[in-house]
């Protein structure tokens, strides 16, 4: 049986904590999500590492200064697009 590499273990661990909604620190809401509570939980660190746009959004003073779970609305995205982006 082949053993997993450190990279595979790390990526698998990240996927697991996202799926289990553990230690999330931001919620994302699409522009077409007009219902309250329709948001996607995510991790700021992962979003920032994968996207320069998210990095810029998450480094604004408004987001950095808050101590609560932020919800960021991305009005130009549809919910299905946002789900695909986060996964």
Swiss-Prot record:
**Chaperone among the record's keywords?**
no
Whether Calcium counts among this entry's keywords is no
Source taxon at top rank: Eukaryota
The biological process GO terms on file are: protein ubiquitination
Q: In which pathway does it act?
A: Protein modification; protein ubiquitination
**Where does the BTB domain lie?**
24-87
Q: Which PROSITE patterns match?
A: BTB
Pfam families named among the record's database cross-references: BTB
Keywords attached to this entry: Ubl conjugation pathway
Protein purpose? May act as a substrate-specific adapter of an E3 ubiquitin-protein ligase complex (CUL3-RBX1-BTB) which mediates the ubiquitination and subsequent proteasomal degradation of target proteins.
The record comments on the domains as follows: The BTB/POZ domain mediates the interaction with some component of ubiquitin ligase complexes.
Question: What's the protein name?
Answer: Putative BTB/POZ domain-containing protein At3g29740
The scientific name of the source species is Arabidopsis thaliana (Mouse-ear cress)
